[in-house]
Amino acid sequence: MIVGSGIDIVEISRFKKASKRWGENFLNKIFTKNEINYSKKRRFQEQHLAARFAAKEAVLKAFGNKLDHIHNWQDIEILNDKSGKPYIEFHKSAKRLKIKEKISKVVLSMAHCRDHAVANAILVRRK
């Protein structure tokens, strides 16, 4: 049963400005080492990071009014399987919320281009 849906869009130019202004502190506060390393291997690093940021925001929105239960951006980690399909690893506070809400699956979709990154997350609860 679908219990939550969230979507987010990020302007790449605004993301680049924030990244340049706040530097490594910004990236390390939002992203895990795995997410940063993945994006560094890509041609358009900022687009990949912005898509991951949008995905994290989409997941938070899908949880709705329970946002205060997730204490750290890094508790929601966006990874890719061998085929390149994105998936989410929940850690610490996000994992506790996932268990509490009986979320069995998160369907995640991300896309990016030169100007924007977008993500959609759908939370599915086991019966």
Predicted regions and their residues:
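Core catalytic alpha/beta fold that binds nucleotide/phospho-ligands
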Residues: 1-127
